[in-house]
Amino acid sequence: MAAKRVEAKDYKKAAATLVDAFFDDPVCVYLCHTTNEQQFKKLMTEMFEYIVYAHIIRGLVLEVGDFAGISLWMGPGNNMDDWYSILRSGLWRLKYKLDGEGRKRFFNEFLPILNDTKADVLKERDDHSWYLVYVGVSSKEQGKGYLRKLIEPIFNICDQEGLPIYLESSHLHNRPIYEHFGFVYQQSIYLTRDNQKVPLEIMIREPETESKAEQSAKPKAALSKTVSASIAEKVEGSLAVSSTPVC
């Protein structure tokens, strides 16, 4: 079963999977800033719908197992917080959905620290990298190998193009999982507008050389030919303008 690209008409399906996968995520709890579970789920749903749609516009959204798992990617030189993406995706509406503290956490703390840290860690490679923004599998579908199918197609592209992959992990127990796939811990950052700091672990996967890839016995995940061609076009287009990020 190969991963498939998510189209705009299915953005709500993709968002629902991520809401289920990240329902107890400490960063999501921190950003939504509410103790009402019904309100929390509503805010999470709206937040992920905006974020998924922004990635459909500017990046790449993959699903596997009939939306059992979802991964959100930004290719070289792209991001979701330019004005075009904010307006088209509806992300601006979060300013009116979150309370005053939630707005400060999301727009004044969360987005800036993510952008600044990524630029600081990757340096001149910031516009020459892939960004794994979110990857999640529905709680009822875990343990079926969906994670590998959601990330390895981009691994293969990055190995061919010599590009690193960057991510932030919001759960400490995820580090060994990502390390299994070749990511290396770099540093931790913290969201600090609460009594207890919320950590995020920065990790990078460097591209494998051809000889190392040939020696690897792990099976390679695949996409359909149509989707693979589409991703290849995105990579080529991003690299062509990688020195000038889309904004």
Swiss-Prot record:
It comes from the Eukaryota. Belongs to the acetyltransferase family. Keywords: Acyltransferase, Endoplasmic reticulum, Golgi apparatus, Transferase, Vacuole. Its EC number is 2.3.1.-. The keyword Endoplasmic reticulum applies. It is found in: Endoplasmic reticulum; Golgi apparatus; Vacuole. Residues 70-205 form the N-acetyltransferase domain. This is Uncharacterized N-acetyltransferase C550.08. It comes from Schizosaccharomyces pombe (strain 972 / ATCC 24843). Transmembrane segments: none annotated. GO terms for cellular component: endoplasmic reticulum; fungal-type vacuole membrane; Golgi apparatus. Gene3D superfamilies: 3.40.630.30. One of its GO terms (molecular function) is N-acetyltransferase activity. PROSITE patterns: GNAT (PS51186). The keyword Cytoplasm does not apply. InterPro entries: Acyl_CoA_acyltransferase, GNAT_dom, Trichothecene_AcTrans. It is an enzyme of class 2 (transferase).
